[in-house]
From Swiss-Prot:
It is found in: Cytoplasm. Its EC number is 5.4.99.62. The active site is at H20. This is D-ribose pyranase. SUPFAM superfamilies: RbsD-like (SSF102546).
Length: 139
């Protein structure tokens, strides 16, 4: 459910259409996007925009009740993992709910993206900088 204003019309549109438990992916520049899934490509060049920049804007608009991460992020990108967990903690406080964090293998994560409403590709070029956001409700 939308909570504010996003300038990108594709992102705004997909968020406004989300129902409870629908998913939306924010990913790095390297994650393969299934041909059956809508791709919203924000990547301009390596690192622009960053994963966290895209995630920050998306979560200003989207009510989130769960987040799915690849287990591999813990070992291969611990700094981003900590930044992401901190962001989710702040989002919980802002939304007034608990956001469940789930982990799965990267291979399974890639399969889950096929069921997503869209995949938003950032310019991030660090490993496992991907999250599946599960939509909540604002009431």
């Amino acid at each position: 459910m939308k909570k504010g204003a996003v300038l990108n019309s594709d992102i705004s549109s997909v968020i406004s259409r989300l129902g409870h438990t629908d998913t939306l992916v924010v990913c790095d520049a390297g994650l393969p996007v299934p041909s059956s899934t809508t791709r919203i490509d924000m990547a301009l060049t390596q690192g622009v925009p960053s994963f966290m920049q895209v995630l920050d804007v998306v979560t200003r608009e989207m009510q989130v009740e769960a987040a799915i991460l690849a287990t591999e992020i813990k070992e291969h990108n611990p700094q981003l993992h900590e930044t992401l967990l901190s962001h989710i903690e702040q989002l919980q406080q802002h939304q007034g709910n608990t956001i469940e964090i789930r982990y799965t293998t990267h291979e399974h994560f890639k399969k889950l993206t096929a069921d997503s409403q869209a995949v938003i590709r950032s310019g991030e070029c660090s490993p496992y900088a991907n999250v599946i956001l599960c939509a909540g409700v604002t009431f």
